[in-house]
Amino acid sequence: MQTVPPTTAPAPAPAGDRRADPVIRVKDLSFRYPGTDRDTLRNVDLTIERGDFVAVVGGNGSAKTTLCKTFNGLVPHYWNGDFAGSVHVDGVDTWDSSVAELSSRVGYVYQDFQNQLVRPTVRDEVAFGPLNFGHADYRERTDEALEHLGIAHLRDQFVWQLSGGQSHLVALAAVLALRPEVIVVDEPVAELDPARAREIYLRLRELNERDGITVITIEHHAEFIAEFARSVVLMADGAPVWHLPVQEAMDRHEDLAAHGVPAPDAVALSAAAGARPVALDVPSAAAALRPVVRERPTGERPTGERPPGERPTGADAPGGADPAPVVVTTGQAAGVDPAPAAPVEPAEPAEVVATLRGVRHGYRSVAGGLSTVLDDLDLDLRAGERIALVGTNGAGKTTLMKLLTGLIVPRAGTVTVDGIDTRTRSAAKMADHVSYLYQHPQQMFLKDTVREDISLFPRGRKVPDAEAIVERIIQEVGLSALADRDGRSLSGGQQRRATLGIGLAMRPSLLLLDEPTSSLDIRSRDDVTAMLAALAETVRCAVVATHDMELVATWASRVLVLDQGAVLADVTPRELFSRPELTARTRLVPPQAARIALELGLDPLPLTAAELRAWLPKEVR
């Protein structure tokens, strides 16, 4: 394994100072979970310097999380198994220390951070750790952590009233109040909108640079790694491949891609233009491309015609609908000027699958007031459409999906699916028409095997040829070898495929997916995206709620932008990302390739790196 050279480590501490020692030292570590026949961690040797900002990357199943759980003793003290080798944190052998003892040295924010919030108010949550450790200064620690993360104004809020980004910062403050030497954050941006994701990383950088805390993130988003990390550990098959400074790691972007971590578009495109070292951000990439970019794309074709071999996207993809014209419902009132719609030939509209008319919905606050989430919503969802719901955390995406399933009914207005008013049928009956796949896939596994979970609905409905249908779906989602495994034991990508199988087994007209690509490596993400693209043969209409703007750019035929309880814009992906005033208003961040293209002033706007390469000379591409 290649390691970070001494010149890239933080400045050395004075001679004899314990701070000169690495904060984490892993030696010949192997670990095997009970009931498995192979080691999850294999002969790991790793050193992390005090004060570093480390990104641990690798494909799903590469043991990133298992490795990091050895740092705070969860492995082997909670997740037991065959443990060999040693892990020292701040000079302490984790084998000889309890998880409680280690928690004051290593703070851990889990991927599912909501499960860490155990107290009713923000102040109580952040004070919980230092108070239970008996620290007399627990009030000072609490106030300090809240101030450092910029959430002191939330101290008296109930945790269930917070947005996803705010909840994540509270979980981080709770571990920060113990003043650890190390903070580990598992998938810090997986469930956040792009603007809040960046805020989390900015806060982590402050803690690292201002307070000297060693920060370790487990991450799939290489764009954040390139901008914020100092060093990168690439994991594969249970062991580090290398540990390198971030610039060297990005220069070896082929290594990253080979292990399921795609290089940021800034890296890949600047490398194609011959930049050495590669660019790590949008301005640097635009500067590298500007001297070679052409005045128009190579082989420019009429709108809608793709270059040979280019992957179809949006409305061009199989089953995609004609692009919807721009409809700004509240944009002018909100200060967003609508873009002029291109003239389109009149066409027979596709059959309506679901409608919402005058829909208003909200939730009661603790104080008893009604907090409106959706207000006077009118929508038609049509056959053949692939719809992306986008907006900030709390914009109402999940509420809209639950209304379509009948899990909740609107406080005013009507929702119909296949002509059925959801107020007149139970959610169980509506499941014959609409399937909803949860944001957290593990919540959908009720049985002991994937096969049983997929067969639960068709067997329960006594569907003819249920067994044959189940076997076909298992093959379609690529889980034949894992069909007899418990779904909860699968990797993130495998769980997503399994839940997609559960949804397809219901044979719905309308398929709803909540954040289907969150926490997935590039291979798993591409697998899920490809399966979504193939849904036209099985599902009449698919709706995805997502913060993944790459998925929006490559999959969607129609984008509904939710903001303050209304549809702010109803547009195609290209129209959305071509309008900086709209994305800024809704705190959306276009894919990195589109942002580079905006810097270069390219028109029509490329949405992906593949599209942007068409603007480069053939010898550069």
Write out the residue ranges for each language-model feature.
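Helix-to-loop junction immediately C-terminal to a conserved catalytic motif
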Residues: 72, 405
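Conserved ABC transporter NBD signature motif
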Residues: 80-92, 413-421, 430
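Conserved ABC ATPase "signature" region
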Residues: 137-154, 354, 464-482
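Conserved ABC ATPase signature
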Residues: 158-162, 166, 486-490
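ABC ATPase C-loop
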Residues: 176, 503-504
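Catalytic Walker B motif of ABC-type/P-loop ATPase nucleotide-binding domains
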Residues: 183-186, 511-514
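Conserved ABC ATPase "signature" C-loop
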Residues: 237-238, 565
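ABC ATPase nucleotide-binding domains
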Residues: 256-352, 582-621
